[in-house]
Amino acid sequence: MRASRFLFATLRETPNDAEVISHQLMLRAGMIRKLASGLYTWLPMGVRVLNKVEAIVREEMNRSGALEVFMPVTQPASLWEESGRYVQYGPELLRFKDRHDNPFVLGPTHEEVITDLARNELKSYKQLPINFYQIQTKFRDEIRPRFGVMRSREFIMKDAYSFHVDQASLQETYDNMYDTYCRIFTRLGLDFRPVQADTGSIGGSGSHEFHVLADSGEDDIVFSTESDYAANVEKAEAVLVGERAAPAQALSIVDTPNQKTIADVCTFLNADPKQSVKALLVQGNADEKGNVPVIALFLRGDHELNEIKAEHHPLIAAPLTFATEAQLQELGLTAGYVGPQGLVEKGLTVIVDRAASVLSDFIAGANEADKHATGVNWERDAKFSEIYDLRNVVDGDPSPDGQGVLQIKRGIEVGHIFQLGQKYSEALNCTVLGDDGKPLVVTMGCYGIGVTRVVASAIEQNYDDKGIIWPSAIAPFEIAIVPMNAHKSPKTLEAAEALYAELQAQGYDVLLDDRNERPGVKFSDLELTGIPHRIVIGEKGLDAGTFEYKGRTDAESVNLTKDELLAKLK
């Protein structure tokens, strides 16, 4: 590609509305332009990167045995009504009607469409297992699109869906997809971690997320220092450590006027929050008459509730909803002063986090306004219904597999794989004839990669004060050739043209910067756009039989002979 025929839409200043580095650099490097909130036009520089990401994804998916399809982004609402997600999905699902008043949605995902395809095309167990994938546009009507293409409303995704006769077959494909994703992200040049994850609104059982490590990541990911254990913070297990000591203090009630938070109480009493418990009162599942019980959760004072874990408890309503003021008043409780003493006797279910369950002589609310209790002990002073893992893990917690301790880092989710089970196949009646001649509900898996998000996450992980530092596999160009004074020096231009043709013939993706611009402008553009290799050709170098080479991360350029240069590029 000749730069004189390419769109270099670079910006010298950072746009004010760009918060994260990937958004800033994608705008400055001329990769994208904003059309509307959460909607972006991809310019030629960005499309080249997108195409390279898609090519790697497509190669590895084909290698895995998956079959490529292409499904409409516009989907009949009736399919979503069949699955139950038309209402459940919420306002992120864009709903509309065509001119014939038929309801449609703009697809945020394609479980319904692929299941409809499968129920019409798959007839026998002999056709299974089978795995379909596509690379297609999605639309989610985010309430607050942010961070450029990191959280946009319209985006490109690779989504795959597999169909099986049983769980064992699904597990084989799931493991295959896990390995495939590891190959994809390795080839993309990303520092990533696969982690155990919650299935969320997609549903199903087993699930793994793939995170690119970056300080700007929105998610906390947890991994062991000495094993391959890894999970997102929603899923990471907090193990029980230690045993409860025998009581050494008598229970005492102390005045704590206007001290409602654990931090306030412990400061007021000059106590360690680790030696206290805090109460969270939530709503349970309604009974047959519609009555909603209140459930009391207790955690150690310095720990935070993991709402996803709480929602998975069979007695707690999902989504997690905290008890109302009216419910507290009916129970005779005051927010900020609730302790476990006497709650079981009142008929409440009391669930205690593992770490809180081993405390003795701790501080708790006294179930009376402006008062707390010290020297509280389980069994003697307060009963509980059960012990349950309720909290977020913290740095230094023991790893659940018994190897090492946990570390927490920030990550950007770029991939997610699920074992869906029969959630969608049952809802849409997707069956095949089994080997006994009877209808068999198929078992499903789904596997997604955010293609546009991969581009942004690669930048979040690879940049400096000059611009992007692309992994070679996805750089818009691998090599840039800059002929000095090309418009005045036929000798330089001729040498540049010859090297350009030779490198292209060897399979390199080369940019010949033949623009009539100052060298400083060209060098700044090439550093900003992240091209890995820069070759400068000048008359002095040609006379000496050398080329000036500089790698994107090199501090200084070096003069190389042609043979040395070609060896350097390999």
From Swiss-Prot:
It is found in: Cytoplasm. GO terms for cellular component: cytosol. It is an enzyme of class 6 (ligase). Keywords: Aminoacyl-tRNA synthetase, ATP-binding, Cytoplasm, Ligase, Nucleotide-binding, Protein biosynthesis. It catalyses: tRNA(Pro) + L-proline + ATP = L-prolyl-tRNA(Pro) + AMP + diphosphate. SUPFAM superfamilies: Class II aaRS ABD-related, Class II aaRS and biotin synthetases, YbaK/ProRS associated domain. Its EC number is 6.1.1.15. One of its GO terms (molecular function) is proline-tRNA ligase activity. GO terms for biological process: prolyl-tRNA aminoacylation. InterPro entries: aa-tRNA-synt_IIb (IPR002314), aa-tRNA-synth_II (IPR006195), aa-tRNA-synth_II/BPL/LPL (IPR045864), Anticodon-bd (IPR004154), Anticodon-bd_dom_sf (IPR036621), Pro-tRNA-ligase_IIa (IPR002316), Pro-tRNA-synth_IIa_bac-type (IPR004500), Pro-tRNA-Synthase_IIa_type1 (IPR023717). Consists of three domains: the N-terminal catalytic domain, the editing domain and the C-terminal anticodon-binding domain. Belongs to the class-II aminoacyl-tRNA synthetase family. ProS type 1 subfamily. Homodimer. PANTHER family: MITOCHONDRIAL RIBOSOME PROTEIN L39/PROLYL-TRNA LIGASE FAMILY MEMBER, PROLINE--TRNA LIGASE. Catalyzes the attachment of proline to tRNA(Pro) in a two-step reaction: proline is first activated by ATP to form Pro-AMP and then transferred to the acceptor end of tRNA(Pro). As ProRS can inadvertently accommodate and process non-cognate amino acids such as alanine and cysteine, to avoid such errors it has two additional distinct editing activities against alanine. One activity is designated as 'pretransfer' editing and involves the tRNA(Pro)-independent hydrolysis of activated Ala-AMP. HAMAP family: Pro_tRNA_synth_type1 (MF_01569). This is Proline--tRNA ligase. It comes from Acinetobacter baylyi (strain ATCC 33305 / BD413 / ADP1).
